[in-house]
Structures are given as structure tokens and as C-alpha cells.
Amino acid sequence: MKINTLQSLINQQITQVGHGGQAGRLTETNPLTENSHQISTAEKAFANEVLEHVKNTALSRHDIACLLPRVSNLELKQGKAGEVIVTGLRTEQLSLSDAKLLLEAAMRQDTAADG
């Protein structure tokens, strides 16, 4: 899935739910009607799809500040210049707001590399 398509899906789900705290999904299931407390395969697929785009992305200080309450969900490393780099996920789901923030960071990095 292209990064722009994934960002559109995230924005649609945030609009549908009304906030970004809900775990993202790659299917059309309605998160408001799903009662399961287990992580669904759609949530796992969503997290893996986002990770595919954001792995090895350097985060800004603002990104880190926004992610701080949930930073334990991410695998991070320090780069050679002291930057914080996303290397993986420690959970099998990712909130819509975190996914949106991480994808925006990946887009900034891609734009800077192309520029």
C-alpha cells in the first residue's frame, strides 16, 4: 500500500471514530461496534503496514514529545548524529494518531532526501 493511501485511510478512520486513540485497521470493520479486547488481524496488518513505511525513520523532537506517553510501544535506536530512529514495534497494534505522526515523519524524511 502506498504511503499516501495509508495516510488517507488513517484520516478516514480518525474522522469516523472522532479521535486518534483507536487502534488502526486495514479492513472496513467499524471500530465502534467491535467488542473484542483481543488484537485483531486487521490491527496487526495495519501496524505492520505502517512499520513498513516508517522503519529507519528519524524522529524530530516534536515527534518524540508527542509519542512520549506511548514510546514504550516502539523500538528505537540512536543514530550516529544523535537522532532517534524507529526500528520496530513492540506491540501488534498502533493508534491512529501515532501512525499518522510516524507516517508524517517518514514523508518529511523522504522529502528531505529527494530535495
UniProtKB/Swiss-Prot annotation:
Protein name (database record): Yop proteins translocation protein M
Protein role: Belongs to an operon involved in the translocation of Yop proteins across the bacterial membranes or in the specific control of this function.
GO molecular function, one term: protein tyrosine phosphatase activity
Protein origin, superkingdom: Bacteria
Biased composition (Polar residues): 27-38
Keyword Signal: no
Signal peptide (from-to): none
Keyword Nucleus annotated: no
A Pfam cross-reference name: YopH_N
Gene from which this protein is expressed: yscM
Residue segments, region Disordered: 19-38
Sorted UniProt keywords: Plasmid, Virulence
Induction comment: At 37 degrees Celsius in the absence of calcium.
